[in-house]
């Protein structure tokens, strides 16, 4: 009689699971960060879609005046949003089990917290997953460093700013018009357009767009001819080919003569590092600016800075912006305040520039 011994396969289930999770041969890399990223992002997306379509109105200001944000309550794609949780909740963690009923949870904007917390964990894990895959493949880690800019921006508007202001009702709504409302109120309360870190962010985003267009057009204009006039130039490139597909010397010569010699990169590596670093650093600064303005360290105030010899104010664009800020502030949350804080606490401000008397 022959006796055979068979090793139990269950002893290696964990090892095979680990190998599958960390395998770079999968069509889509999962990784250990992906183990947390996938369920959190799926939860955030599912709750966002359901809330955007069907969530009942939310008492965002905590004054029993609900704001409707979902499609089924009369909104469209532009006006719809997942409305932030109620000011009555403040900074309290508000999961479903903390509410007395599902209706109460919906009325107080519980879905907003569910979405942003899962979303922030998910995008942080996506950043970690980028590093993890780079590590497995022996690549340098700069991809995740670049992605840290949008992660920092999202963290600033969804987490840091509400913490600084004392309530998640001050977080950015999850919708198009809600985002615009957030921007307008942010300008009214913090004068973000006059903050140097926001200016750096504008330079980063607009400059990055300009440099991207310049680089793409230069490369496309200096391709090595591999096709005839009747063929698409895209057929002149084969994936993985060793030869350069464009002439960097020609591109450098063109741009150096168009502007001046040292305005043009002669090193492809430093050029592409610059293209990545410029917008990333700009967005880092904007996220840092929002995080400081969260605690009311606001933009520059040049209101009524110029006066004549008689002490009369000579209006500047700073005064025009200040007047616009006051108008936006008095109009937002108009039923939540008896009197706007800036107007109640500050000096008397004229509502119009002094006009000269009319003789006639």
Swiss-Prot record:
It is a multi-pass membrane protein. The record marks 161 as: Tyrosine radical intermediate. It catalyses: 2 a plastoquinone + 4 hnu + 2 H2O = 2 a plastoquinol + O2. Tyr-161 forms a radical intermediate that is referred to as redox-active TyrZ, YZ or Y-Z. The record marks 190 as: Stabilizes free radical intermediate. GO terms for cellular component: photosystem II; plasma membrane-derived thylakoid membrane. Chlorophyll a ChlzD1 binds at residue 118. Cyanobacteria usually contain more than 2 copies of the psbA gene. Photosystem II (PSII) is a light-driven water:plastoquinone oxidoreductase that uses light energy to abstract electrons from H(2)O, generating O(2) and a proton gradient subsequently used for ATP formation. It consists of a core antenna complex that captures photons, and an electron transfer chain that converts photonic excitation into a charge separation. The D1/D2 (PsbA/PsbD) reaction center heterodimer binds P680, the primary electron donor of PSII as well as several subsequent electron acceptors. This is Photosystem II protein D1.
